[in-house]
UniProtKB/Swiss-Prot annotation:
Protein name per Swiss-Prot or TrEMBL: CMP-sialic acid transporter 1
One GO MF term attached to the UniProt entry: sialic acid transmembrane transporter activity
A GO biological process held by the record: sialic acid transport
Family statement drawn from the similarity comment of this UniProt entry: Belongs to the nucleotide-sugar transporter family. CMP-Sialate:CMP antiporter (TC 2.A.7.12) subfamily.
Keyword Membrane listed: yes
Keywords, sorted A to Z: Golgi apparatus, Membrane, Sugar transport, Transmembrane, Transmembrane helix, Transport
Length: 340
């Protein structure tokens, strides 16, 4: 699995992520959900847990103990609680943010996580980026934001700047938490040589427990009006709903692979391109009207993608090297001696 080219996994992640919103929309009935959407993340975590367990079992049977490394020390295992805790806080901050700003403003502010990921990537993982790569990350944020901005004829342009200051502060916090969770997960995946499937098993075990805690909290909040969550967990589920669960679980597994064998920037590009792909697909599936902003956003993001990942010699003309310059001088000297 580790020998798989990272760009293949990144493209697959882009396709699956782009279909996430489409499948979720198709799972609705009469403009709403017949199922409890809070159960979807829980089942996705369980799916990832089962798949990781099966792959770990297979790896342990077919590989030697030297190639399949597992760290069971509690000091190491407990670190996997932190990403789940960050995501739990992030989800609550998301809901709080949406009480102050509208959906369009929230989506645009969400693009701050692109830049914050780059900053945390440098600060915490000590990974250096070239000036050209920093420019590419900035362009990616501009491109995704441009594609989401509506024209003044469709919605009030002033609405982007009329929210209370608390809304903007919470939006910045939300972007920071999202980036921090990704960066910390990458740190965990690369801090030792443990097999990916064992790391996933730890990550998704705590993820499942936190999702159970959320479902129980929802039951208490609503006074068990519809009964305990485990008695109605599959109520209203359709084939499309199960596809949403499988899609969400599969994207999670791909993200963890990228965290182990690539990095957060690759994931950011994959998810950003997925957003644009979703918009394009919506033109055909949901009669979404394409806009100039969407076209410009796609062009800018493609430019950013090329700037970040293309080999340097394809972007600029490389200067003459000292070695080549020395050869030129020798040639001139020889010619002068011949003439004399």
């Amino acid at each position: 699995m580790a020998a798989t080219p990272w760009y293949f996994v990144a493209v697959l992640l882009t396709i699956l992520t782009s279909s996430q919103g489409i499948l979720t929309t198709l799972s609705q009935s009469d403009g709403g959900y017949k199922y409890d959407y809070a159960t979807v993340p829980f089942l996705a975590e369980v799916f990832k847990l089962i798949i990781s367990g099966l792959f770990l079992w297979r790896e342990m049977r077919t590989s030697s103990s030297t190639t399949s490394r597992i760290t069971t020390d509690w000091k190491s295992v407990r670190l996997f609680v932190i990403p789940s805790l960050i995501y739990l806080i992030h989800n609550n901050v998301q809901f709080a943010t949406l009480t102050y700003v509208d959906t369009s403003t929230y989506q645009i502010m969400g693009n701050l996580k692109i830049v914050t990921t780059g900053i945390l990537f440098r600060l915490f993982l000590k990974r250096k980026l070239s000036k050209l790569q920093w420019m590419a990350i900035g362009l990616l944020a501009v491109g995704t934001t441009t594609s989401q901005v509506k024209g003044c004829g469709e919605a009030s342009c002033d609405s982007l700047f009329t929210a209370p200051i608390q809304g903007y502060l919470l939006g910045i916090l939300s972007a920071g938490l999202s980036a921090l969770a990704g960066i910390y997960t990458e740190f965990l995946m690369k801090r030792n040589n443990d097999t990916l499937y064992w790391q996933n098993l730890q990550l998704y075990t705590f993820g499942s427990l936190f999702n159970v805690a959320r479902l129980i909290a929802d039951d208490f909040r609503h006074g068990f009006e519809k009964g305990p969550w485990w008695q109605r967990i599959f109520d209203g589920y359709s084939i499309t709903t199960w596809l949403v669960v499988l899609n969400l679980g599969s994207t999670g597994l791909l993200v963890s692979w990228l965290m182990k064998y690539a990095d957060n920037i690759v994931k950011v590009y994959s998810t950003s391109m997925a957003m644009l792909l979703t918009m394009v697909a919506s033109i055909y599936l949901f009669s979404f009207k394409p806009t100039l902003q969407l076209f410009l956003g796609i062009v800018i993001c493609i430019m950013s993608l090329h700037m970040y990942f293309a080999p340097p010699h394809t972007l600029v003309d490389l200067p003459v090297t000292n070695e080549a310059h020395a050869k030129t001088l020798k040639q001139v000297v020889v010619e002068e001696k011949t003439d004399s």
